[in-house]
UniProtKB/Swiss-Prot annotation:
Protein known as: Phenylalanine--tRNA ligase alpha subunit
Enzyme class: ligase
GO cellular component, one term: cytoplasm
CDD domains the record matches: PheRS_alpha_core
UniProt keyword annotations, A-Z: Aminoacyl-tRNA synthetase, ATP-binding, Cytoplasm, Ligase, Magnesium, Metal-binding, Nucleotide-binding, Protein biosynthesis
Family membership: Belongs to the class-II aminoacyl-tRNA synthetase family. Phe-tRNA synthetase alpha subunit type 1 subfamily.
Cofactor comment text: Binds 2 magnesium ions per tetramer.
Lineage: Bacteria, Pseudomonadati, Pseudomonadota, Betaproteobacteria, Burkholderiales
Length: 354
């Protein structure tokens, strides 16, 4: 190495030390990313200080070029490390400022989770079960797809009865294992037949206690308007024994209405009517202000043919049955005038009963 090259190398080393010091100071003084990027270009850009020094290596002899090149790369790494550290510091400062601005006061009360509630019809369903359960009635369940025999024939409906037509009943393709027609049940009365038959089998050869059961559930008919739906909920009741009378029917149902509507002054009348499965039969009406009466149930003494289909001797056993729409009871209890509101799922409507 010549004396001139030695002097040049010493000067370059001094320049490198100064570049490191200047870069560290410049980066530390940068208060935002834009300023930091400008300072980066001053030292590491295409025309930056370190880049210019690298260009000058070509004037040195091979041995000196190798030594100084390594030194310049070392300095470059120091400058890049200072740049990275400052970038991280700025990012941390920005995050801390954002967190401070968006800080959550953990002492504030939380937002309550919205709670659901029972559908008004289900409230009625449970209330009916509770009232009848308190006077010794069981609750029975059964299939919604029934046979033509169980839904109609067992209940003394003649073959030419209008209810059997496709205009009133949803029939299902296919038949059961006994080749009987299948349909969506039009009432929950088939559950009464099933329950009674099981009751008779259970107490075969023994003293049989009275049959007291209610049968709530979904039913289906070809009908749809403001007061009718193709699917609706119904509850039917049955009480059969050796000395059950029509007076018992009047007493049980009147007591039920008073408890359901929580009124002791309810006026009820039993109006003669016709149903294939009861004889005598009656519509049950309830008084609603201004001398108006509203039908709320059908009822009557169980027909002897139905008792036979249940496996009971009509000469020994007698009983009564009734059936009420749960939607109708719900509408009367809450003053609702359109049945379709129950099926629309409007949360604004349902919240009124939460």
């Amino acid at each position: 190495m010549s004396r001139r090259q030695a002097i040049s190398t010493t000067a370059m080393s001094q320049d490198l030390d100064q570049i490191v010091a200047d870069a560290q100071a410049a980066f530390a003084a940068a208060n935002d990313n834009a300023t930091l990027e400008n300072e980066k270009a001053r030292f590491l850009g295409k025309t930056g200080a370190l880049t210019e020094l690298l260009k000058g290596l070509g004037k040195l002899d091979p041995e000196t070029r190798k030594t100084e090149g390594a030194r310049i790369n070392q300095v470059k790494q120091q400058v890049e490390a200072a740049l990275t550290a400052r970038r991280q510091a700025l990012a941390d400062a920005l995050m801390n400022a954002r967190l401070s601005a968006e800080a959550i006061d953990v002492t504030l009360p939380g937002r309550a989770v919205s709670r659901g509630s029972l559908h008004p019809v289900m409230r009625t369903w449970e209330r009916v079960e509770q009232i009848f359960g308190s006077i010794g009635f069981d609750v029975a369940d059964g299939p919604e797809i029934e046979t033509d025999w169980m839904n109609f024939t067992a209940l003394n409906n003649p073959d030419n009865h209008p209810a059997r037509s496709m205009q009133d009943t949803f029939y299902i393709d296919g038949r059961d294992s006994d080749d009987k027609l299948l349909l969506l049940r039009t009432h929950t009365s088939p559950m009464q037949v099933r329950y009674a038959k099981m009751h008779v089998e259970k107490y075969a050869g023994k003293a049989m206690p009275p049959i007291k059961v209610i049968c709530p559930g979904r039913t289906y008919r070809v009908d749809s308007d403001a007061t009718h739906s193709p699917m609706f909920n119904q509850v039917e009741g049955l009480w059969i024994g050796e000395d059950v009378s029509f007076a018992d029917l009047k007493g049980v149902y009147t007591d039920f209405l008073r408890k359901f509507f929580e009124r002791d002054d309810i006026q009820v009348r039993f109006r003669p009517s016709y149903f294939p499965f009861t004889e005598p039969s009656a519509e049950i009406d309830m008084a609603f202000g201004n001398g108006k009466w509203l039908e709320i149930s059908g009822s009557g003494q169980v027909h002897p043919n139905v008792l036979r289909n249940m496996g009971l001797d009509p000469e020994r056993y007698i009983g009564f049955a009734f059936g009420s729409g749960l939607e109708r009871l719900t509408m009367l209890r809450y003053g609702i005038n359109d049945l379709r509101l129950f099926f629309e799922g409007d949360v604004r409507f349902l919240r009124q009963f939460a």
